[in-house]
C-alpha cells in the first residue's frame, strides 16, 4: 500500500474544555467589591528576621531610659529608701542588663533549636540559666 501525504488540519489544542461547576461559575460572575486592594503582607517570619538583623547591627539601647530608671528605683526602694543615682550609674546598669538579656536570649534560642523548634519557650530559658549556673 502506497503512502499518502498528510494534509495540515487545525488543532483544537488537545482535550475539549470541561464545564465549570456551579460554584466556580458563580464566583467568577460575581462583581468585585469596588476594586479594594489588600495591603501587602510579608510571609510569616520575614519581618522577624529583618528586625533581628537590624537590631544585631545597631548599638543603641532598646529599653527606654525612663521606664528602666523607674524600675531600678522601685527595686532599690526594697533595700534602702531615699537612694540617689547618678545618671551614668543608671546608664551603666542599663547597658549591662541589655547585654545580659541579649546573651540569655541567644542561649535560649540555641536551646530551642536543639529541641528542633523555632519558637523559644519558658523551658528553654530555664535550661539556658541552669547551664550557665544561675539559680532558678
From Swiss-Prot:
Sequence similarity: Belongs to the histone H3 family.
Subcellular location(s) per record: Nucleus; Chromosome
Keywords assigned: Acetylation, Chromosome, DNA-binding, Methylation, Nucleosome core, Nucleus, Phosphoprotein
Gene3D superfamilies, per database record: Histone, subunit A
Residues bearing PTM N6,N6-dimethyllysine: 5, 15, 28, 37, 80
Other comments on record: Present with 213000 molecules/cell in log phase SD medium.
GO BP terms in the entry: aerobic respiration; chromatin organization; global genome nucleotide-excision repair; intracellular copper ion homeostasis; nucleolar large rRNA transcription by RNA polymerase I; positive regulation of transcription by RNA polymerase I; regulation of DNA-templated transcription; rRNA transcription
N6-succinyllysine: modified positions: 80
Xref: PANTHER family: HISTONE H3
Residue numbers bearing the N6-methyllysine modification: 5, 10, 19, 24, 28, 37-38, 80
Positions carrying N6-crotonyllysine: 10
Keyword DNA-binding appears in the UniProt entry: yes
Pfam families (alphabetical): Histone (PF00125)
Protein name: Histone H3
Modified sites of kind N6-acetyllysine: 10, 15, 19, 24, 28, 37-38, 57, 65
